[in-house]
């Protein structure tokens, strides 16, 4: 049976600008969407102009003071927020730019809407390439990330799903997501990333395994410079298979940061676009409801190629290596192909012995897991997104969610042990 895929894209999200010289370029989202359109992939998906997340949505995870600050600060008034800029780590890596809160609202709303659609079985796979900002913390911005759309989406998924698996293939450790769920067995976090030599964010050692109820439900795979497709595959596939077998997630969130590709402006790995895509294809093969998000990626043309290719893999559609002509065609010079050679001269410092050592340690940690922790069943809290919204229909929107209804059995609703009032946050 073909997967039903929802794809979320806000036509304005690529127009935001972090500032001159900043490596994070939201414009990469416009390039990605253009390729998705010109390859005709949009015909195989339900395409939605996403919901905009509110301050209330963001405060599911973040502190009210921090979100209130993001909503109020602007380049014109930031001189009056000197203390807050320091407190909330907003400045160099995470600058104040025009429309900052609006940008956060758009990418977070799309991820949240994807989670809600998965909960309501409107789709089997939800894609938001604008999301995946995994470094943001409860009280502060970090690593180009302001609002952690991943954590907010997982909290929404936990209303219906007893166990959510989070997988991160960005070159940087998914520290914000790990920190949020470090003490719970409701979410298992698995991150493959560069570790050592003071590489940002400096966390993600394989001995960070979770604590309290979450002990051994946090898995880190620290890698060295220059890892290639073959080495990555030899670790990724057995580790993820073992995790899925042990944990039996009912939903998976996959962060597809493209800075793990070779030739990335801030990266030091040697993955090809096909190698990166293999990870996405492998996760999809488990046929578990899947939320697919973007993340890092700083060589814009290759980010667009990568996420377009991965969209095609999720749709099981073959697309040509020859790029279709589009308004951004010149970005892909000189070869104008989907799969250019992105290998670098960086030596693969991940020896067989090192990879085997990691694999053994990871598998030892997995043996400590309880198989598939169970969760007490409660009434489900109300949805973050109200399906009864009376917004005017958007003429640009291909599908309207109001058209989808599904009978729901009471025993489909999972929640934490202390939360059954239909109003408050999911207890983790």
Curated annotation (Swiss-Prot):
InterPro entries: HDAC_PDAC, His_deacetylse, His_deacetylse_1, His_deacetylse_dom, His_deacetylse_dom_sf, Ureohydrolase_dom_sf. It catalyses: N(6)-acetyl-L-lysyl-[histone] + H2O = L-lysyl-[histone] + acetate. CDD domains: HDAC3 (cd10005). Zn(2+) binds at residues 170, 172, 259. GO terms for biological process: circadian regulation of gene expression; epigenetic regulation of gene expression; regulation of circadian rhythm. It is found in: Nucleus; Chromosome; Cytoplasm, Cytosol. Residues 386-405, 415-428 have a biased composition (Basic and acidic residues). GO terms for molecular function: histone deacetylase activity, hydrolytic mechanism; metal ion binding; protein lysine deacetylase activity; protein lysine delactylase activity; transcription corepressor activity. Keywords: Biological rhythms, Chromatin regulator, Chromosome, Cytoplasm, Hydrolase, Metal-binding, Nucleus, Repressor, Transcription, Transcription regulation, Zinc. Inositol tetraphosphate (1D-myo-inositol 1,4,5,6-tetrakisphosphate) promotes the histone deacetylase activity by acting as an intermolecular glue between hdac3 and N-Cor repressor complex components. One of its GO terms (cellular component) is nucleus. SUPFAM superfamilies: Arginase/deacetylase. Responsible for the deacetylation of lysine residues on the N-terminal part of the core histones (H2A, H2B, H3 and H4). Histone deacetylation gives a tag for epigenetic repression and plays an important role in transcriptional regulation, cell cycle progression and developmental events. Histone deacetylases act via the formation of large multiprotein complexes, such as N-Cor repressor complex, which activate the histone deacetylase activity. May play a role in the regulation of the circadian clock in a deacetylase activity-independent manner. This is Histone deacetylase 3. It comes from Tetraodon nigroviridis (Spotted green pufferfish). The lineage of its organism: Eukaryota, Metazoa, Chordata, Craniata, Vertebrata.
């Amino acid at each position: 049976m073909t997967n039903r895929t929802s794809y979320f894209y806000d036509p304005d999200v690529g127009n935001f600008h972090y500032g001159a010289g900043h490596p994070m370029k939201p414009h990469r989202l416009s390039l990605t969407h253009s390729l998705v359109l010109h390859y005709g992939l949009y015909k195989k998906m339900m395409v939605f102009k996403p919901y905009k997340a509110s301050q209330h949505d963001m405060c599911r995870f973040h502190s009210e003071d921090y979100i209130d600050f993001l909503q109020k600060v602007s380049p014109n008034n930031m001189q009056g927020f000197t203390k807050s800029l320091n407190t909330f780590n907003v400045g160099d890596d995470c600058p104040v730019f025009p429309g900052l809160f609006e940008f956060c609202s758009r990418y977070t709303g799309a991820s949240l809407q994807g989670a809600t659609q998965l909960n309501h079985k409107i789709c089997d796979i939800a894609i938001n390439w604008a999301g995946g900002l995994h470094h943001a913390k409860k009280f502060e911005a970090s690593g180009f990330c302001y609002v952690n759309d991943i954590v907010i989406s997982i909290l929404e998924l936990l209303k219906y799903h007893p166990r959510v698996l989070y997988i991160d293939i960005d070159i940087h450790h998914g520290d914000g997501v790990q920190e949020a769920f470090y003490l719970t067995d409701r979410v298992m976090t698995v991150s493959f990333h560069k570790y050592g030599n003071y590489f940002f964010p400096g966390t993600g050692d394989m001995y960070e395994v979770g604590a309290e109820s979450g002990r051994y439900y946090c898995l880190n795979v620290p890698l060295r410079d220059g890892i290639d497709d073959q080495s990555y595959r030899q670790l990724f596939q057995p580790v993820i298979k073992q995790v899925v077998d042990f944990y039996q997630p009912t939903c998976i969130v996959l962060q597809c940061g493209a800075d793990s590709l070779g030739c990335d402006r801030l990266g030091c790995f040697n993955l090809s676009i096909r190698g990166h895509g293999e990870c996405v294809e492998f996760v999809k093969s488990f046929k578990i409801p899947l939320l697919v998000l973007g993340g890092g990626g700083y060589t814009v043309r290759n980010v667009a190629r990568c996420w377009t290719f991965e969209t095609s893999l999720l749709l099981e559609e073959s697309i040509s290596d020859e790029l279709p002509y589009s308004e951004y065609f010149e970005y892909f010079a000189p070869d104008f192909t989907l799969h250019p050679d992105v290998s670098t001269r960086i030596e693969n410092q991940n020896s067989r012995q090192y990879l085997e050592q990691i694999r053994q340690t990871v598998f030892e940690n997995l043996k400590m897991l309880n198989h598939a922790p169970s969760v007490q069943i409660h009434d489900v809290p109300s949805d973050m997104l109200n399906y009864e919204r009376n917004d005017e229909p958007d003429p640009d929107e291909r599908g309207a969610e109001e058209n989808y209804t599904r009978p729901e059995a009471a025993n489909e609703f999972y929640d934490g042990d202390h939360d059954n009032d239909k109003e408050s946050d999911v207890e983790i």
